[in-house]
Amino acid sequence: AALVLGRARKNVVVIDDETPRNWVTRETHGFVTRDGASPREFRKAAKEQIATYPTVQFASDTATAITGSDGDFEVKTTQGASYRTKKILFAVGNKDLPLDINGLTEVYGKSAFVCPYCDGWELRDQSLVIIVSGDKALHMAKVISGRTERYTICTNGSDSLTDEQREELKRHNVTVFNAPIQSINSEEGMVQQVVLNDGTAIPCTGVFFQP
């Protein structure tokens, strides 16, 4: 948005708290000419290109309050700055909310991910655990099956799968575990196994989960 507006010679302030969704990952994927770049490299290149347009400026800050109405807004930030503007564009994106599972924080962004389109290639043909339940289970099973045939679904204690959903997963030889997850065991950020409360240990080298 800042690039397009800068090229249109509009005065723009980008208020950015420098905590993007993908900050925990080592690489970003799916962007032509930037596939495999780290999030920091990607943002650095983006800012350098946008900085060539003199009407765009960046503020490493967080907006805390907006007052006024269309054509005359005031934006205040945590650092005490105040900006007057005619228009406001929200480009806040999404935030992943990791599940409350022991050991997930240590592997999140290294060998445990949310998006198979973003990180599935790197885990292709590996043994994976998919932490998901309900309608999302069938969707994730279809998506993951294109990356690997070796995957297991853990519902983490949820009993939201219908008999029809379980039967369809069974037809595709997908094993489903219903017990709550006790922990995700890892070494240096790489998943080794997922352990359930009933003592079942599922060896794997990667995890996908749905917040």
Residue ranges, per PLM feature:
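Rossmann-like dinucleotide/flavin-binding elements
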Residues: 1-17, 108, 114-163
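Glycine/Thr-rich phosphate-binding loops of Rossmann-like dinucleotide-binding domains
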Residues: 23, 98-99, 204
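Helix-loop-beta segment of a Rossmann-like dinucleotide-binding subdomain
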Residues: 24-39, 65, 72-75, 125, ...
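FAD-binding core/adjacent interface of flavoenzyme oxidoreductases
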Residues: 13, 57-126
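Short amphipathic alpha-helical segments
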Residues: 2-3, 26, 100-103, 141-143, ...
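Conserved N-terminal glycine-rich FAD pyrophosphate-binding loop of Rossmann-like flavoproteins
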Residues: 4, 17-41, 165-172
